[in-house]
Amino acid sequence: GKELANLRAEVGMVFQSFNLFANKTIRENVTLALIKVRHMDKKEAEQLAMDLLARVGVDSQASKMPSQLSGGQQQRVAIARALAMRPKVMLFDEPTSALDPEMINEVLDVMVVLAHEGMTMICVTHEMGFARKAADRIVFMSDGQILEENTPDEFFEHPQTDRAKDFLSKILTH
């Protein structure tokens, strides 16, 4: 009940499908939970929203509707919306898998900054360059099982399992 609600309030989530409200502006997407859930004053919520939208590089899009933004921009709005609730932990589920290749880096760059600022993040990703750069730990899973857990350097330089070696040989060919 209440304990679960309190825990959820400390966890931000960003999914591959951005889950923005299509009928709300970008600014309103970020302020909605601040006003309705956190009971923040509207002006204060709007200022925080603009600060966060600036942080992820889409503050100039604040008055637009989600359909007017690229996928990469929408995903950065989703990150700003999650950050607005001041979570202790951010969960990312394949945040770049639905994006065009040229949009991927703009989302990953924001996530790298968050990691370097000390945000605790759990990220499901196939973006190995990003994982290597941003992670403190790599947990390699296959078929629902944890096969390896290590530092990024150890995982990429000395994978322990045949499955990890095979995966890395296929994904790191270029």
Language model features with spans:
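ABC family nucleotide-binding domain
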Residues: 1-152
